[in-house]
Amino acid sequence: MPENKITYNPKIAGRFRGYLPIVIDVETGGLNPATDALLEIAAVTVNCDAQGVFYPAETIAHHIEPFTGAVLNPDSLAINKIDPSHPFRFALQEQDALEQIFKFLQAAQKQANCNRCVLVGHNAWFDLAFLNAAINRSKIKRNPFHGFTCFDTATLGALMYGQTVLAEALKRAQIPFDNNEHHSAIYDAEQTAKLFCKMVNTAGWP
C-alpha cells in the first residue's frame, strides 16, 4: 500500500476553506460514466511551502479493470491508446484501486488539517462524474471528495490565459506539454497540477 513520503503543510486549509485540492485525471472507454469503463485514474496531491507557494507533491495512479458489462468505445480507445486486455497493465478492480487511492489521499488530507478533498481537473465535471459512478458501483463509504464541488482548470485557464484547451493553457503558462504523452492519466494529471499551482500562485492568497 503506497504511503505519503512528505509532510503536508496545514496552512493549506486556510487557502481553500478547509479543502485539500487533489488533481484527478481519468482515462475511460467512452463518455458516459454510467455505462462506460473507467480504465485509468491518477491523483496528484498539492502542497505549499513555508512561504505559501503551492507545488505538485505526490502522484498515485492505477490501471483499472473494466467493470462487468462496461462499454468500451473503439473511438475512445483510439484516442487514449489503451488496450484493456494487455497483460502488462496490471490493472486492479475499481474498488481495490479506489480504496488504495483514497487511503493515500485521506492521510494527506489529515496532515494538511483539511476537512475534505476537492477534485481539481481539466473539464473537472467529466472526471468527477466518472469518479462518482465508480464509487457508487463499488459501494465505497469513505469517500474523501466533496460530492459536487470541484475546481476546473479549463475555466480557470480561460480566466487567467484566455485558453480552455489544456495544451494551450500550459503553453501560455510556459509549462511544457508533450502531445505524445497526452491521454496518459499520470501525465495529464501531473501537467494539470503544474497549471493549477501556477494559477494559484499567480492569484496569491486572499
How does the language model describe each region?
Residues 25-27, 127, 152, 188:
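Acidic active-site catalytic centers that drive phospho-/nucleotidyl reactions
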